């Protein structure tokens, strides 16, 4: 399962536990980890760290907008990794934050409003690629002339294409095929009565214009 609400899924997990049904969580953790057998996730915190470090190499100072999704642990961790990395650097300022629920349709109007309220935006850190795309569309619709660094997390085909077009600055790569394969392996081992790792964390890398040519633009990793 891939929970939309990391706390709200508790009743379903309890029902599965009661019937001794193994539960494998993929992509984002649940709050009640004792109710699941295996959690397979990207290193979401590190994804945020990588975006922040790249930004700091490109900008000596910045006014930053954050696009979040507080109901998912993965989204929270990505933003936390970013904010922790810049915390001791006063030259990087978070000037606004909006929960977009990870959706392009919510990101676009919220960023349009933020652009109207803030004239000097340097960086937009998005919890995933769809919200980054919404941010880019908002900047375009408002005719925002200043170059803005826009980061996402996913490594989606569309995100990589936008990087090749110099529209998106970077995206921290997820490996959904690896996560899926790990989930199937864990399921077989659980059904066979074998011991399995409680948590599997898959490392991340950052895709930018400097290395995007190393990746397949037509498919996920």
Across the structure, where does each feature detected by a protein language model lie?
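Short, solvent-exposed amphipathic alpha-helices that sit
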Residues: 47-51, 74-92, 106, 110, ...
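Hydrophobic alpha-helical
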Residues: 1-17, 82, 95-96, 101-161
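Second-shell loop/turn segments in exported
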Residues: 35-39, 68-72, 95-99, 120-122
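Hinge/cleft segment of the Venus flytrap/periplasmic-binding protein
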Residues: 85-86, 175-221
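Flexible loop/hinge segments that line or gate small-molecule binding clefts
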Residues: 6-46, 57, 63, 154-165, ...
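Hydrophobic alpha-helical segments within soluble ligand-binding/sensing domains
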Residues: 39-64, 76-77, 104-108, 156-159, ...
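Structural detector of well-ordered beta-strand residues that form the stable sheet scaffold
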Residues: 24, 65, 95, 125, ...
């Amino acid at each position: 399962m891939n929970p939309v609400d990391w706390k709200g899924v508790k009743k379903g997990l309890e029902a599965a536990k009661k019937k001794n049904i193994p539960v494998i969580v993929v992509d984002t953790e649940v709050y009640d980890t004792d109710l699941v057998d295996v959690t397979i996730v990207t290193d979401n915190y590190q994804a945020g760290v990588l975006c922040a470090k790249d930004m700091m190499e490109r900008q000596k100072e910045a006014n930053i907008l954050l696009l979040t999704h507080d109901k998912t642990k993965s989204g929270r961790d990505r933003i936390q990794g970013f904010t922790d990395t810049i915390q001791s650097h006063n030259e990087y300022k978070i000037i606004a934050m909006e929960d977009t629920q990870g959706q392009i349709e919510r990101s676009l109007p919220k960023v349009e409003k933020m652009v109207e309220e803030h004239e000097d935006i340097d960086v937009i850190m998005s919890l995933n690629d769809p919200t980054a795309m919404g941010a880019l569309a908002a900047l375009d619709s408002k005719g925002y002339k200043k170059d803005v660094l826009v980061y996402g997390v996913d490594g989606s085909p569309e995100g990589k294409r936008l990087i090749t077009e110099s529209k998106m600055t970077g995206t921290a790569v997820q490996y959904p095929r690896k996560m899926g394969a790990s989930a199937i392996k864990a399921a077989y081992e659980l059904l066979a009565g074998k011991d399995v790792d409680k948590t599997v964390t898959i490392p991340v890398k950052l895709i930018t214009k400097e290395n995007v040519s190393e990746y397949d633009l037509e498919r996920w990793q």
